[in-house]
């Protein structure tokens, strides 16, 4: 059967290819003294707190399982708005909040609403691989701009200004980032947003790990940015968020985006046609995420992630898997495996394939599943 050129352009999500191989091997070694240790998939090992689970069960028992509005339950949009006020001191109109089937759906909707054929979107290298495919699916082109450890693997306003061209539509950023766990400094973020706004472009920012910030200097939403002249830049920014990471609901497939008011009707039309609505059960469950007991539990878990980071990164460095920048958020480590590749006789000069081969060697030698950098760039 002929496959569309659009589908052919989409590369495999190699993270999941590694996960499949690890799952097969895990079954073979499950009852040995060296079972598989999974460090590869970007999800918490915590599950939804008890109140959230109970809310889901109650929704099913009460028959609250039919379609909602395409933009989501009004009550949940209100709760999210209240969370922005409580946590960040931001007044976000609930009408700007659109519930989606995970952050991936939010990114897809944003790209389809904003990108025309031939438009270019600037993004850092390394970055989350699916982002460039969301752009491609909207018939746009991703322009990857190399970053360095000195930049915390994030774009600078100077890079954005230098790379901006006649077909540039905007930038797609993530702070904290997958795969580096690093954030954009607020001053730099303001300069980037100002640069983009002055050129009539749009700033999309993935903030799904913002709740897992470990450094107060970086833990603020870009929605609160103010320009040099006092204009509220945040009103022109699209922020993508999710119940997956901080709220520990990965398989529930529920996220949201905060969009400029004028863009919401277009996003709603797309959502009506593509998704009908997000999972109704997940939405009712998510209402309980904002109860005081749930929020307290999330903060305890965030502290646990920081403690793990403080132990894990020095140990990786000691093993020769150098992490050039200490992550300030999320739960990732962007480690340099070239030295380990050399020790194991692997190709250290080709970062993409070297990391791929290293991941499989690690899987088979030590029964540890880790994600190679092949997907992410650089």
Please provide the spans of the model-predicted regions.
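Conserved N-terminal alpha-helix of the aminotransferase class I/II PLP-enzyme fold
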Residues: 67-101
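Conserved small-residue
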Residues: 22-25
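C-terminal edge-of-domain segments
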Residues: 64
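PLP-dependent class I/II
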Residues: 3, 7-11, 16-18, 28-59, ...
């Amino acid at each position: 059967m002929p496959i569309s050129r659009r589908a052919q352009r989409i590369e495999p999500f190699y993270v999941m290819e590694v996960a499949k191989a690890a799952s097969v091997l895990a079954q073979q070694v499950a009852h040995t003294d060296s079972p598989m240790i999974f460090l590869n998939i970007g999800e918490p090992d915590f599950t939804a707190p008890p109140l959230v689970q109970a809310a889901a069960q109650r929704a099913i028992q009460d028959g609250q399982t039919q379609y909602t509005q395409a933009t989501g339950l009004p009550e949940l949009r209100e709760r999210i708005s209240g969370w922005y006020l409580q946590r960040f001191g931001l007044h976000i109109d609930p009408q700007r909040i659109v519930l989606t089937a995970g952050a991936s759906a939010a990114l897809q909707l944003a790209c389809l609403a904003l990108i025309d054929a031939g438009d270019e979107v600037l993004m850092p290298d390394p970055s989350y691989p699916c982002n460039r495919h969301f752009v491609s699916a909207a018939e746009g082109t991703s322009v990857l701009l190399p970053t360095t450890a000195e930049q915390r693997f994030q774009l600078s306003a100077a890079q954005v200004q230098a790379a901006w061209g006649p077909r540039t539509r905007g930038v797609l950023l993530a702070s904290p980032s997958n795969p580096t766990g690093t954030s954009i400094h607020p001053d730099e973020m303001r300069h980037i947003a100002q640069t983009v706004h002055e050129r009539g472009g749009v700033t999309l920012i993935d903030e799904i790990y913002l709740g897992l910030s470990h450094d107060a200097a970086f833990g603020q939403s870009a929605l609160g940015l103010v320009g040099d002249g006092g204009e509220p830049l945040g009103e022109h920014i699209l922020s993508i968020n999710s119940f997956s990471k901080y709220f520990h609901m990965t398989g529930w497939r529920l996220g949201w985006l905060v969009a400029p008011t004028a863009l919401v009707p277009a996003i709603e039309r797309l959502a009506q046609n593509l998704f009908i609505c997000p999972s109704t059960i997940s939405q009712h469950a998510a209402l309980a995420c904002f109860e005081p007991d749930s929020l307290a539990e999330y903060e305890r878990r965030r502290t646990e992630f920081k403690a793990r980071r403080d132990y894990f990164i020095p140990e990786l460095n000691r093993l020769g898997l150098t992490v050039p920048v200490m992550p300030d958020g999320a739960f990732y480590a962007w480690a340099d495996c070239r030295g380990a590749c050399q020790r194991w006789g692997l190709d250290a000069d080709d970062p993409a394939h070297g990391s791929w081969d290293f991941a499989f060697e690690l899987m088979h030698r030590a029964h540890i599943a880790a994600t190679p950098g092949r997907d992410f760039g650089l």
